[in-house]
């Protein structure tokens, strides 16, 4: 016996299955072009579970142990232990899609509460129960805009400061529907209204803006952006997140038709993935919403019951009529976000958001006292979580030197770094300021 926990089919089992389907060899079940097939040994030695764990831990120890001040779309907040305790219950962590509502009422109710949280924060009429991440949610918003617009058109306008990775996903995901993605100029970390107005025409189907922006600034001209979009019969899509939305103007109050973003700021640590795409929109677009919706109804006994509804995905209807061709979502991550939000409560969520205004303001003031550093770059703006700082020395060199000191920051251009501070790294701000002083003076 190998000690493996996996029971692979015996030779007799394999022969019986091949005989049942009428073939002689396993190879006959596949049609793989020779140029991409592999017929050889992998060169991987069999290991026990204990040996495999040692190898993985040894490899993980090669990672740099940095205190991150990175941000730019990925923000870590303290996640209470309650979130792990509840979300790792077997009925949650082993559940797949809730196709059998009679046995998944608990999970469905949590997802309904998650949707309700987003509806309350955005002021919009409907929110789905998650998408992959902010980038795919933005791409789905562009496709929705193209579907619902009365007139023809295919142009989508995004601010110049939006991360290249988001724009790449947007372009790639919409490439089959002739959507043209264009950037419009920004001014001092915010929308340049003159540039946006000059870019508008009858072919624009959606205008995208952020609050807070990729630069960390609070966008102060959202109503004007919404008016511009509306005057050209284009949808206004706003990017944000649940923590920031708890203290900012509600998206519906500035004219937003769609809200996208990443809700993994609640319930999840930062990592190489596992985002939580936000998608909320006006109720009139209900049947155009991508992904899944959890609805509340009644069972045969008249008791409130939850179920998946309006699943207009290609998994359920004809592909050409589907609103989305992404066939899964982030239900378990949404569950964690809902648990975290419930733990915070309305007041706690606001307190956390207000702290995210105070922390960057205080840290920027301290860095501004360092010789060779000017912070924040956008000193006439309010910031949430992050800000940009000008460095006399080349920013890439400053970022590399800080990495050697154990801190991670983004170099966003030749002489600008971006710094993010939250409740997860505020304990290290004294050491961070000292490191910046050491590498800058």
From Swiss-Prot:
Enzyme kind, highest EC tier: oxidoreductase
EC number(s) from the headed UniProt entry: 1.4.4.2
Regions that span the bilayer: none
GO biological process: glycine decarboxylation via glycine cleavage system; nucleoside metabolic process
Keyword Oxidoreductase tagged: yes
Similarity comment: Belongs to the GcvP family. N-terminal subunit subfamily.
Subunit: The glycine cleavage system is composed of four proteins: P, T, L and H. In this organism, the P 'protein' is a heterodimer of two subunits.
PANTHER family per UniProt: GLYCINE CLEAVAGE SYSTEM P-PROTEIN, GLYCINE DEHYDROGENASE (DECARBOXYLATING)
UniProt protein name: Probable glycine dehydrogenase (decarboxylating) subunit 1
